[in-house]
Amino acid sequence: MKTVTEFQNKNILVLGIAKSGYAAATLLQKLGANVIVNDGKPLAENVLAAELQAKGMDVVCGGHPLELLERNISLVVKNPGIPYSNPILVAAKEKQIPIVTEVELAYRISEAPFVGITGSNGKTTTTMLTFEMLKEGQKHPVIAGNIGTVACEVAQDAKENEVVVTELSSFQLMGVELFQPKIAAFLNLFEAHLDYHGTKKEYGLAKANIFKNQTENDYSVINADDADVMALSAYSKGQKVLFSTTKEIEDGACIKDNALYFKAEKVVEVDDIVLPGQHNLENILAAMSIAKLLGVSNEAITAVLKRFTGVKHRLEYVTTINNRKFYNDSKATNMLATEKALSAFTQPTVLLAGGLDRGNEFDDLIPYFKNVKAIVTFGQTAPKLVRAAEKAGLDTIESVDTLDEAVVKAYAHSTDGDVILLSPACASWDQFKTFEERGDIFIQAVHKLI
């Protein structure tokens, strides 16, 4: 960890605890700050807040009183999930108090360079692929952020010869000031999180913060097939490395003659890749570009792609029952992810979908229903998905209350050779704490059929 003195004796407000807030508060106390911790949950129900209080921190729970800003606050470190419309953040902005997220702290203390990966879909798969390729290539990667350990915990132990690989959301990237990844990858962009950002434009600009501090000594890995990403890459001063699944790119990564190429050099045959889905070729090209820029050999990249079958809850194969294959794609929290999941299969498919209603309709899914023989909907969006399925002309459409019921119904509507796919196209928070919980419940329900 770098020697950092900028926080000593400063009053710093950590807003929202959870994992990242707890880690940030603990780090800041170690760095000599006077830490004030604030969380909306009452102290009596807040185990992490009680632990921080026991460490000697000033803890205020049960709301976000504006009076906290009268304590000569030098910096606010916010939980990514707390919107900037929260009155205490609005007031902090008016007072010109800097507002950052925990990843900014991680960057400031880290001896190791960062690789940052963002996009609407594919972040986790690309991050894991990058980590595995760098590990196989003996580049000493450590993984942080939304996957695994909180970034500022990882950064404390990261050494100069290591690489911190981190998946970054738009929420995290809105709160960066100095964060400067050696390599920044922007995978794709489509309309999402409008309840937080308001418009697609603002969402895209938040993502583009990944380029904010890059210089000509850094690299920006860009999806050349995404017009929005290409436009936002104008914010990067780094060396641009493009990737594409649709056209040849001499100075970047592409697919040619059934092989993946980087800067006109063949790296791996497509037939050697075991990860399913056309969309995953985009993720692979991005990860391969990062790995090649950091000096990983073609042999190491190929070795990873011959064994990497995917990430849990992302088009995860579960089991086969009576020649029906079950797949868990609970991470599909938006339509684009479900479109890509449906495109991965040519077999007749029974789709399970539904979840939190964020105000959108589902007509964009209709062209992807060509192999869908039945749909079972659940959650808040069930009526909207039923409408889309009816417009698509599906014969078998069911709505149920729970995911357990959906699995039973889906199996009943399937026949020999079918795929049964959970790909909700919605966030999970109407019925589940996380998409991981939703996926685990799906897997448990599937195994009950055996």
From Swiss-Prot:
Question: Which top-level enzyme class is recorded in the Swiss-Prot or TrEMBL entry?
Answer: ligase
Any one GO MF term held by the record is: UDP-N-acetylmuramoylalanine-D-glutamate ligase activity
Q: Where does ATP bind?
A: G119, S120, N121, G122, K123, T124, T125
Translocase as UniProt keyword: no
> Could you list the residue ranges forming a coiled coil in this record?
none
Compartments, as annotated in UniProt:
Cytoplasm
Provide the GO biological process annotations: cell division; cell wall organization; peptidoglycan biosynthetic process; regulation of cell shape
This protein's pathway: Cell wall biogenesis; peptidoglycan biosynthesis
Keyword annotations of the record? ATP-binding, Cell cycle, Cell division, Cell shape, Cell wall biogenesis/degradation, Cytoplasm, Ligase, Nucleotide-binding, Peptidoglycan synthesis
**What EC number(s) does this enzyme carry?**
6.3.2.9
Which domain of life does the protein's organism represent?
Answer: Bacteria
UniProt cross-references to PANTHER family, sorted A to Z: UDP-N-ACETYLMURAMOYLALANINE--D-GLUTAMATE LIGASE (PTHR43692:SF1)
Briefly state the protein's biological role: Cell wall formation. Catalyzes the addition of glutamate to the nucleotide precursor UDP-N-acetylmuramoyl-L-alanine (UMA).
Hey, which family's this protein in?
A: Belongs to the MurCDEF family.
Q: Which HAMAP family match?
A: MurD (MF_00639)
What is the protein's given name? UDP-N-acetylmuramoylalanine--D-glutamate ligase
Origin species? Bacillus anthracis
